[in-house]
UniProtKB/Swiss-Prot annotation:
GO terms for biological process: DNA catabolic process; DNA-templated DNA replication. This is DNA polymerase II large subunit. It comes from the Archaea. One of its GO terms (molecular function) is DNA binding. The keyword Acyltransferase does not apply. It comes from Methanopyrus kandleri (strain AV19 / DSM 6324 / JCM 9639 / NBRC 100938). Heterodimer of a large subunit and a small subunit. Keywords: DNA replication, DNA-binding, DNA-directed DNA polymerase, Exonuclease, Hydrolase, Multifunctional enzyme, Nuclease, Nucleotidyltransferase, Transferase.
Length: 1240
């Protein structure tokens, strides 16, 4: 343990040292040139408190939060104390602030701490926290003099002073509050109310207003669900009304949709449009998370939230329905609701032939990722590949799918009638390539970690019977049989559930309570000791390699000791009826007289063939004969009760009921077969999981649309390609005016929109465009830092942008390029452009900049805790340099075949990303050398050279980057991350995608001044960097990931009883148990290789929708667990018909655009020409786009439209839509701009 601690400390020190070294390089570089600021604009943070300070630009929070956490022992409680201290002015986060600003900062800081200061919700999700006047909703501010001890509240509408007793608090939410998650969004409202109470403001009362505010909330939710979309939880109207009437603060919001309310309009302080952020807080926050809120309300003694009890009680009826006897779990078809054309359905809910649930976590699964056999990826024609997202029936909603070879593969029927189990992925690939698979009888097992059930609060369900369960169960069954044979029934009942290791002790305790002490003592204790000795000396040695046990050994073990049959050779008896078993016994013919050397033949009868296929018995056809060969022949005969020596079937063992009951074998056929065999036959696959394809895997460079090389405005002067070089060479006839930062070089006396003049090196001066005075001397109420300048040089040096001179200057320093794509205009507030030198160097490397000045690559997230060196291009020497000195068995690393445990911030890049990153490193070296005049730092020439370098990982909707270390390259189209760094970004692995950047790129090129000046502009930007991750300060979802090497027998027994997931928490080791030292993690299943399987989904390789749809239906025809007619119906209902309706509706309401300058028009000019540049004005939605799914829909109706009444209804709907299209466009489905307006 000391070694593990030392290694982890050394790893963290290295991350900190290298990060600091890169900060020094970036600081030195930026001080030399024209970057927006002379130092890196990303703050390196080591704790939540520091991240809060960097995110919200406040101070004194980090130290105080650390003190309170140490004092209170609870971060959430410390958060409420921070809120209180900020409002009271005891904690000064921005000097002396008036009351309304203290409240605003307090709520934002509180939310930032609750979200680990990773997401941008505290900045972007809360538009404002306002004090408002009761009855009017007018905003009220504190105009008292510093230090603001006695607030003076003044209405901003009329300027009158307002009594605090006549005020209330409102939180104005925006769309990005979604990034906080439901719990944090709900807690933000609770924090705001706590702030209100500390500030001494009255509670919000909707009855104070002349308008029906409660009805407004209800109408908004109903309208949103009807016209916009759905929430994770869709509350009833009664629930919304209950919240709206009783919430102590006003939940307000910015308009996020164009859709307006119809009934409750024109309320003075509210917009008519839907307020998506406010609705999300109510629905997914307060309503959905009411039970969690109640705990906080009680814990912190916050008054006014008693209505939450009624919210929770409304769900009690549903809970009562779930109190039935827990013997099964109902199929759940929610995952099928939005089936997309071209993305196949793999299994209907809980359908026979669907995925068989198996408990376990491989080194590349867990944290919402599941494992399937790589053969499955091939037999689905490559639709499902490494990193593809699946929408699943349970335990969660979605999962990333990854290859695991230590689970059972799919079983298929070939065109020659053979049934084959595809243990070898290479065989599966070959069969698919030759098109020899006729039907996929079974999809194989899906490996799901028990932690997923805990995290999703899903009841445990019976898993597939597997070797790791069997090997723990065998000794227990030997114990039970021994006790039953040798002890009275009352003693047996008392001892049967006692674990083997405590059996002798418990027997001794029981014996001490008997009247006949000698006889009783000799009985139970003697029996217990003999059983323990038998298990220790004879049984356990035979279980050393359960995966490699032969069928002869398995039969001998079960017949000798009466233990359940080995799961590898157990067939799916629960998928057939007892009468089917009798048919098999009557129809078979046996050749051979000893186990392991048998052959079973059946006449090629359709019913017998069906039964064998249902059982998943591998077999082949020889003329008119069905042949089952070893090892399956012996396995089948043993389970049917056949004795090869006598050539007869055994008599039924009617005395097995006690053992079958003890083992909770409920299925009628399994009980019947068990009695025939003379030993228990478990349900092989009691739980099936339905699934469909979700998002494809992804590994792709992030590009803006259209993609620029540099953030430099060129308007239309660069043509459609925005090519600055084209303008520079005089090849473009267009000119334009663009908005840029109004900075003047005092030395050159002209407009230079940079911090430092690139011509003379003088620091420029910011001017105000309203008064033409330096910003420092400006008296304007709202200074305007932007000037509209001519691209061409004019007579006024203050209003012309010297583009050609800037290009010439850049070419002198870094060379030239044929093409240099800029942007039409800057979207930031100051509109300060990037230096052109950076763009030229990017263009030379074929790299494209993102909105914040960085270069990014997007990948689907996949988890990885351990890696085999050769999988990722690591040599033993390189591995030792990275700190991997010993493998998982404690042996020194000397071979590429050894498996090592990753460190918490390690990542494995896909090759495509690594090749891109090589170009980025070369660009950064060029930048340092040619532009900044410094020595290069990377020296990277090939992907493997990236190993050991640091990157910055960033999730969408967040504002905190996390430093990661590259430890390998894999041939995949997703990336593997240690789950801890994934959780540090508040992301799991259910199909989410994140981005990475090179660390030096972020430090050199990122600037807040480039970010868009609009709501959400600060999202998806690395405002703060975490160099070293603290496992206590990450998304706690990952804490439930199991990190044990196996599961105890008790867990499987709990699963058979459908126990609550919480009962599993104490049975397995989870990451939460190792937060102090997250090393020594284990996994239950290994895989041959983390890159074994196809890597590019067929969905992406097929270009036409017709091809994708045909392939989807063809796969549906082949998979036994799927009904192709249902697939076609769902595709029409959830994809084609809504799209056709929406597109036809949008066509009539569309806007128009100029083909040349891209100007937008609600109503096009009568001339059809753009008044700005003379370009042609075009439609934005064309008839072909509006009707693109009409023909595929018609073909589906033609094929399936007469199946039932529901299909006939769909057929009528398609017919009506076709008539509507003809009315709009005519029979040729084409229309020009003139025709759109009815002109000839």
């Amino acid at each position: 343990m000391n070694r593990a601690r030392e290694e982890l400390d050394r790893y963290r020190e290295t991350l900190e040292e290298v990060s600091s070294r890169f900060v020094d390089v970036a600081t030195k570089a930026r001080q030399r040139r024209e970057d927006p600021k002379p130092e890196p604009e990303v703050m390196l943070a080591t704790s939540i408190g520091e991240r809060v300070e960097g995110l919200l630009q406040v101070e004194n929070v980090a130290d105080r939060l650390e003190e309170l956490e140490e004092e209170l022992g609870d971060r959430e409680e410390a958060t409420f104390r921070i809120v209180e201290e900020v409002i009271k002015g005891e904690l000064k986060v921005k000097g002396d602030l008036p009351l309304h600003k203290r409240i605003d900062y307090a709520v934002r800081i509180g939310l930032a701490v609750l979200t680990e200061a990773v997401v941008s919700a505290p900045l972007e999700g809360i538009a404002a926290v306002e004090i408002r006047e009761r009855g009017t909703g007018h905003r009220v501010v504190d105009e008292s003099e510093p230090p603001h001890e006695e607030p003076k509240l003044v209405c901003t509408e009329c300027g009158k002073e307002v009594d605090p007793e006549n005020c209330y608090l409102a939180v104005k939410y925006a769309g990005p509050i979604r990034a906080a998650g439901g719990t944090a969004a709900a807690l933000s409202a609770l924090l705001a109310d706590y702030a209100r109470q500390v500030a001494g403001l009255p509670r919000f009362n909707p009855d104070d207003f002349d308008h029906d505010l409660v009805g407004r909330y209800v109408e908004e939710v109903v309208t949103y669900l009807d016209k916009v979309g759905s929430f994770q939880y869709n509350p009833s109207e009664e629930e919304v009304e209950l919240v709206a009437k009783n919430i102590p603060i006003e939940i307000d919001g910015e308009p996020t949709e164009e859709v307006e309310v119809q009934g409750h309009r024109d309320i003075p302080h509210l917009p008519n449009q839907l307020r998506g952020g406010a609705l999300l807080v109510i629905c997914e926050g307060i309503c959905q998370k009411a039970p969690k809120l109640i705990k906080r309300v009680e814990k912190y003694g916050i008054d006014g939230w008693e209505f939450l009890e009624k919210l929770v009680n409304k769900g009690s009826d549903d809970e009562e329905e779930g109190e039935e006897e827990k013997t099964k779990i109902k199929p759940n078809d929610k995952y099928m609701g939005e089936l997309v054309a071209g993305r196949p359905l793999l299994s209907h809910p809980s359908a026979k032939g669907g995925f068989r649930l198996r408990y376990g976590r491989a080194r590349n699964t867990g944290f919402a990722a599941v494992g399937v056999h790589p053969s499955l990826m091939y037999v689905t024609k490559g639709f499902i590949v490494i990193g593809t997202q699946l929408k699943v029936e349970r335990p969660g909603k979605a999962a990333c799918v990854l290859p695991v070879t230590e689970i059972e593969p799919p079983v298929v029927k070939l065109r020659d009638g053979s049934v084959v189990r595809l243990d070898d992925p290479r065989e599966a690939k070959e069969l698919v390539e030759k098109d020899e698979i006729e039907e996929i009888l079974d999809l194989g097992e899906m490996l799901v970690a028990v932690g997923e059930f805990i995290e999703n609060n899903h009841p445990l369900v019976p898993p597939a019977y597997c070797p790791e369960w069997w090997v723990k169960e065998v000794p227990d069954v030997v114990k039970v049989i021994g006790l039953r044979k040798n002890l009275p029934n009352d003693v047996f009942e008392k001892l049967k559930d006692v674990p083997l290791k405590r059996l002798v002790k418990e027997a001794s305790r029981l014996s001490g309570n008997g009247n006949n002490l000698d006889g009783f003592l000799n009985g139970p204790v003697k029996v217990a000791r003999s059983i323990v000795e038998l298990v220790r000396k004879e049984v356990i040695p035979r279980l050393s390699s359960p995966e490699r046990m032969s069928v002869e050994e398995a039969i001998e073990l079960s017949r000798e000791y009466g233990v359940p049959f080995h799961p590898k050779y157990t067939f799916l008896w629960h998928d057939v009826k007892p009468k089917d078993v009798d048919e098999l016994r009557e129809a078979l013919e046996v050749a051979g007289s000893e186990w392991g050397n048998l052959r079973v033949e059946f006449e090629n009868d359709g019913e017998i063939k069906r039964i064998l296929e249902d059982l998943l018995v591998p077999h082949r056809l020889e003329d008119d004969t069905i042949v089952v060969e070893e090892p399956w022949a012996s396995a089948l005969l043993a389970q049917l009760g056949y004795d090869p020596e006598s050539g007869e079937f055994r008599e039924q063992d009617e005395d097995l009921d006690y053992l079958l009951d003890y083992l909770v074998i409920r299925d009628e056929t399994c009980r019947y077969v068990s009695k025939l065999a003379g030993f228990p036959i478990r349900e092989k696959a009691p739980t099936r999981i339905g699934a469909r394809m979700g998002r494809p895997e992804k590994a792709r460079e992030r590009k803006m649309s259209p993609p620029p090389h540099v953030l430099f405005p060129i308007g239309i002067a660069g043509g459609n390609q925005r090519d600055i070089m084209k303008f520079h060479r005089g090849e473009s006839e267009d000119t334009d005016r663009v908005e840029v930062c109004y900075r003047i070089c005092p030395e050159c006396d002209r407009l230079v929109p940079y911090r430092v003049c690139p011509f003379c090196g003088t620091e420029t001066v910011q001017y105000c465009n309203r008064c033409d005075e330096p910003a420092d001397e400006c008296d304007c109420e709202e200074p305007d830092p932007v000037v509209r300048a001519d691209i061409e040089r004019n007579d006024d040096p203050y209003s012309s942008l010297p583009v050609r001179e800037l290009v010439r200057r850049a070419e002198e320093e870094v060379g030239t390029t044929d093409t240099l794509k800029g942007v039409k205009g800057m979207t930031s507030r100051l509109k300060m452009p990037e230096p052109l030198q950076k763009g030229i160097l990017r263009a030379k490397r074929d790299l494209f900049v993102f909105k914040d000045g960085t270069l990014r690559f997007d990948c689907n997230d996949c988890p990885l805790t351990h890696v085999r060196l050769k999988e990722v291009g690591l040599t033993p020497f390189k591995a030792r340099l990275l700190g991997f000195e010993r493998d998982i068995n404690g042996d020194p690393v000397v071979s590429e075949d050894q498996v090592v445990e990753l460190y918490p911030q390690d990542v494995v890049l896909p090759r495509k990303a690594a090749e891109w990153a090589v170009r980025v490193c070369q660009y950064l070296d060029d930048l340092l050398r040619k532009y900044y005049g410094l020595e290069p730092v990377y020296g990277v020439e090939k992907p493997e050279d990236l190993i050991g370098h640091l990157i910055v990982t960033l999730a969408p909707h967040t504002s905190c980057g996390v430093v990661g270390r590259v430890v390998g390259i894999a041939d995949i189209n997703c990336w593997y991350n240690h789950p801890i760094i994934n959780a540090a970004r508040r992301r799991n692995c259910d199909g989410d995608e994140d981005a990475f950047m090179l660390l030096l790129d972020v430090l050199l090129n990122f600037s807040r001044l480039y970010l868009p000046d609009k709501r959400g502009g600060l999202m998806d930007a690395p405002l703060v960097l975490t160099a070293v991750v603290d496992p206590y300060e990450i998304d706690d979802e990952v804490w439930n990931m199991d990190v044990c090497g196996d599961y105890p027998l008790e867990l499987y027994r709990k699963a058979l009883e459908y126990a609550d997931a919480g009962e599993a928490e104490e049975l397995i080791e989870r990451l939460e148990d190792r937060l102090d030292l997250p090393r020594g993690l284990q996994f239950t299943h290994d895989t041959e290789a983390i890159d074994l399987g196809p890597t590019v989904t067929r969905y992406s390789r097929l270009e036409k929708m017709e091809e994708k749809l045909e392939e989807q239906l063809d796969l549906a025809r082949r998979i036994r667990a799927v009904d192709e007619s249902d697939v076609a119906k769902i595709v029409l209902d959830s994809h084609f018909l809504p799209d056709i309706k929406g597109n036809l509706r949008k066509f009539g309401r569309q806007k128009f655009r100029c083909s040349r300058c891209n100007a937008k028009f609600n109503v096009p000019p009568l001339s059809g020409k753009c008044p700005r540049c003379g370009g042609d004005v075009l439609l934005t939605i064309y008839p072909a786009t509006a009707t693109k799914y009409l023909e595929p829909a018609k073909r589906l109706v033609e094929e399936f439209g007469t199946h039932d009444e529901e299909w006939r209804t769909i057929a009528s709907e398609v017919e009506l839509l076709e008539e509507e299209a003809k009315t709009l466009f005519g029979s040729d489905h084409s229309v020009s701009l003139k025709k759109f307006f009815g002109e000839t």
